[in-house]
Amino acid sequence: MLVLATEASGTLGGSALASWTPITTLLVAYAVVVALLWWRGEPADGDKAPLGALQRIGRGLTRTTGIPGWAAIAIGQSLFALLVAGVGFYSDVAWHIALGRDEQLFTAPHAGILLGLLCILSAAVFGTIVATLDGWERGWRVAGFRVPWSMLPLGALGIGAVSGFPMDEVWHQAFGVDVTMWSPTHMLMIMGASFT
């Protein structure tokens, strides 16, 4: 991807627009899928925006997949998260090979990685909200929310993966650039995403 951006702009590293293209494309595709699922979901009396919209998307997923909406939302959001984080990771490796160490923290590849990791965490949150709105009976009750048992490890993995991102910047400032991917902070992010 970086090579294509470099060729398109005629400069090393490509233009800012070219480097944001993969993430932007994924977000547009995500928005289209969410809109289609919302359209496919059945509205219910008493749906309140924006939570009602999330519940309606869950109904669309139930209608499409046959599994409970809260589980389908968590699975779908997690798969999207892994795709975005994977594209960000791939782009980041290419960036570092071509350009070396970043001058700033929020490059397009880093933003893709962080967005993917945040989406893992949001999968647990969305799954919990839809389970609560749908009246799911199994799981842990916390402050009026019904947290399905499977959302607990998903949320913990999401928190671990997201927390690795700021710690990685501190690590690089303290110890410099890693020669390999196997620093503790990289492993925290990679393992959090992988076990999702």
What are the roles of these predicted feature ranges?
Residues 40-74, 132-151:
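Membrane-interfacial, low-structure loops and terminal tails that flank and connect transmembrane helices
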Residues 2-6, 83-99, 159-176:
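C-terminal ends of transmembrane alpha-helices
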Residues 1-18:
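Short, strongly hydrophobic alpha-helical membrane anchors
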Residues 26-31, 76-88, 154-162:
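Alpha-helical transmembrane segments
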